Amino acid sequence: MKKHLAGLLTLLFLAVGLTVQAGDDNDKEVKIKTSAICSMCKERIERNLAFEKGVKESNLDLKDKVVTVKYNPKKTDVAKIKANISKTGYDADEVTADEKGYAKLPSCCKKGGHH
């Protein structure tokens, strides 16, 4: 009986481990054009995306102004990610920057501003 129980527990742990592992394969990636200008913009966008449920990682390329976001589609979607960027004060593809978020940006991070 103990051997059967130990065998069942081993199978259970393996099945759970494989399920957790398989979840990583289902992550998606999206590239979003932003209105970011400087390293402060990059830091602000990446930091706020880190708090978005389901976002695994983000990286903003300042040269292209494109943020690449890896996310779990079961926990978030592209619309929520764009809304997060907008609320932070930046354009996100066709979604324009939220006025309140934009007003909070330092002048160097606003359109036409430079470091």
Locate each region found by the language model.
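Bacterial Sec-dependent N-terminal signal peptides
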Residues: 1-26
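Mature soluble domains of exported/periplasmic/lumenal proteins and thiol-rich metal-chelating peptides
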Residues: 24-115
